Amino acid sequence: VAKTPTVEHDLREISTPKGALRYYDCGPESGPVLLFLHGSGPGVTGWRNFRGVLPTFAERFRCLILEFPGFGVSDDFGGHPMVTAFGTVSPFLDALGVDKVHIVGNSMGGGVGINFAIANPDRVGRLVTIGGIGTNIFSPSPSEGIRLLQEFVEDPTRQRLVDWLKSMVYDQSLVTDELAEERWSLATDPATLDAARRMYGKAAFAAMNSAMAASDRPLPWAVMHKLTVPTLLTWGRDDRVSPPDMALIPMRTIPDAELHIFPNSGHWAMIEAKEAFESTVLAFLSRGNG
């Protein structure tokens, strides 16, 4: 069993005009830099998304876990947390004096990573996404996991949180009382809940869909042909938040993309398929000098 790294309480911060960005920094200082970008959802943090795989990656890489604003660790910058997240990567890396990174982005973090890599192709070596990007082709939208997330955000109860957590995983036994309690305490923090409602409340979701329908700008999945860095798309076969049919457009349109689907795994492939995820991603990151 992988030993939990000793960086749990080594939370650092940088100041920005909008508030503090907090992050973890571990692994060899002289190693290539691997930036982890977390997903969204009740009680999420970068640390919780990636603490399990950190010991493996920190052996070879300087690992940075950025905590996005509005999720209870970094300050809340206001606005739509997903939109805010897009603007944090460049100033974060600039403040640390880091020129180039590999990126592992989970769900929303994958979208942030793609956006950053399209805008800054010279700053990204290789990019790994975990579910959550693309668009539904055959599966209904919103997905089961997103609907359960909306229900929790509208009216938070422990049972709704457990129902949502169970939609995140293939192995239902992973949703323990301990996990639910850990998520509940942060998810129901008033400021964090307010930020979640700005993103996943039914009114916010409807407003976002209306804005996208009225916009002349292409939707995120329609600009992925502009992504030039080598990209590994990873997915859980049994993902009920972002079903695997969402991978088809990114797989076809990203020029240098490969797709790896893990069996018996839901939206948290890096947790449910930990060893296979680690070996697959390490092999990809170790290929070439990019």
Name each region found by the language model:
Residues 227, 233-235:
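Short beta-strand/loop motif that positions the catalytic acidic residue
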Residues 257-290:
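Catalytic active-site module of serine/aspartate enzymes centered on a nucleophile-bearing elbow/loop
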Residues 54-55, 65-104, 279-282:
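Active-site loop/oxyanion-hole signature of alpha/beta-hydrolase fold enzymes
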Residues 105, 109, 113:
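Gly/Ala-rich beta-loop-alpha elbow adjacent to hydrolase catalytic centers
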